[in-house]
């Protein structure tokens, strides 16, 4: 066992504070690595503020983790000391259900996936995330970060990247397809870059035009304000695929009307309240309303390799751990373009 520095939440109302946590001893199949960078995901904030249920405090958030291997177990074959690696939203699953065997561990129907933080590991201890100096994870849930991807830019790909890559791949985004992205934030800006790299024609749908210049620079061919009622008339029946990256309650009927025959609107965010789904827009053009959650280990590795090949990198702002609480406030105020990444050097010393 080892003791490492970390930042933890102790309640829904208090700021995160520096503390120490214990990491398990490296087992035969484990990989230990020093964390160099950890992204801040809005899910971290939802969790520590108990908006998705009361967590098991203290909580060390962070499921966008990148670093360098320091030790491997005696049976490890995939990694060696010095390798550049990452960990995303989960660190284990049952490994026996059909979904796990298919490389869709995020949909595990056995134990359910074991979250990187605020979950219980196989040994009965709580999992703690990437706002820390080091971590120990089973090799089967560790990802290899390609040499051409900087570690700081790679970190957000382990949640924001795979959350958008998976539905783009599943619903066949590519040449000849028109993709719309609702929201240009942490998820949305990566979705635009990925869809463009896949060869799709990309449109951003945002409440206002204030990020229009960014959207076009990132790869969108068009940018529309959803606050303008004419937008929905103008774009009716235009898209093969729409990714909803925001957690706000939307008029689903209006957005479904933007889809072509057999088009799909994919929910990636988690609205606070249920949304009404009108039947007519679904029936009229055999449209689909569906959802997607992160991605399995094989697909996440595929995503990292794709991003390296196509030079897809999130737009990030690097911070130190003592700025985490201010960063949370800025995320809530939509004052980040487009992902905070914590440089954890001070937690490794």
Swiss-Prot record:
Induction: Has a higher specific activity when grown as a surface pellicle rather than in agitated cultures (at protein level). Disruption phenotype: Not essential for growth, strains missing one copy or both grow slower and have a different morphology than wild-type. Its cofactor is Zn(2+). It holds the Pfam family ADH_zinc_N. Keywords: Isopeptide bond, Metal-binding, NADP, Oxidoreductase, Ubl conjugation, Zinc. This is NADP-dependent alcohol dehydrogenase C 1. PANTHER family: ALDEHYDE REDUCTASE. Zn(2+) 1 binds at residues 41, 63, 159. The keyword Transmembrane does not apply. Zn(2+) 2 binds at residues 94, 97, 100, 108. Its EC number is 1.1.1.2. Binds 2 Zn(2+) ions per subunit. It catalyses: a primary alcohol + NADP(+) = an aldehyde + NADPH + H(+). It is an enzyme of class 1 (oxidoreductase). Pupylation of this protein has been demonstrated, however it is unknown if the protein concerned is the product of this gene, of the identical gene adhC2 (AC P0CH37), or of both genes. There is a cross-link at residue 210 (Isoglutamyl lysine isopeptide (Lys-Gln) (interchain with Q-Cter in protein Pup)). Prefers aldehydes over alcohols. GO terms for molecular function: alcohol dehydrogenase (NADP+) activity; zinc ion binding. Belongs to the zinc-containing alcohol dehydrogenase family. The keyword Ligase does not apply. It comes from Mycolicibacterium smegmatis (strain ATCC 700084 / mc(2)155) (Mycobacterium smegmatis).
């Amino acid at each position: 066992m080892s003791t490492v520095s970390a930042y933890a939440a102790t309640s829904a109302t208090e700021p995160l504070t520096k503390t120490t946590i214990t990491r398990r001893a490296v087992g035969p199949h484990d990989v230990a690595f020093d964390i160099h960078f950890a992204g801040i995901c809005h899910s971290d904030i939802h969790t520590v503020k108990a908006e998705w249920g009361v967590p098991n405090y203290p909580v060390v958030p962070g499921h966008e983790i990148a670093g360098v291997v320091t030790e491997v177990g005696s049976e490890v074959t995939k990694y060696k000391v010095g390798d550049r690696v990452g960990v995303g939203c989960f660190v284990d699953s049952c490994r026996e259900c059909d979904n796990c065997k298919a490389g869709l561990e995020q949909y595990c129907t056995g134990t359910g996936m074991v979250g990187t933080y605020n979950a219980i590991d196989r040994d009965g201890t709580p999992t703690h995330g990437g706002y820390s100096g080091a971590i120990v994870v089973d090799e089967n849930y560790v990802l290899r970060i390609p040499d051409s991807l900087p570690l700081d830019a790679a970190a957000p790909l382990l949640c924001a990247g795979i959350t958008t890559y998976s539905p783009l791949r599943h619903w066949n985004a590519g040449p000849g397809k028109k993709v719309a992205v609702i929201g240009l934030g942490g998820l949305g800006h990566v979705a635009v870059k990925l869809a463009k790299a896949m060869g799709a024609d990309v449109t951003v749908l945002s409440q206002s035009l204030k990020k229009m210049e960014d959207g076009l620079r990132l790869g969108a061919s068009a940018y529309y304000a959803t606050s303008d009622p004419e937008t929905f008339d103008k774009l009716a029946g235009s898209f093969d695929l729409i990714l909803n990256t925001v957690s706000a309650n939307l008029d689903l009927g209006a957005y479904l009307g933007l889809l072509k025959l057999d088009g799909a609107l994919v929910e990636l965010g988690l609205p606070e309240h249920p949304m009404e789904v009108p039947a007519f827009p679904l029936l009229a053009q055999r449209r689909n309303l569906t959802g997607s959650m992160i991605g399995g280990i094989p697909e996440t590795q595929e995503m990292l390799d794709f991003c390296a090949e196509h030079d897809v990198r999130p737009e990030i702002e690097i911070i130190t751990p003592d700025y985490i609480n201010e960063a949370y406030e800025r995320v809530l105020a939509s004052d980040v373009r487009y992902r905070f990444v914590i440089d954890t050097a001070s937690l490794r010393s």
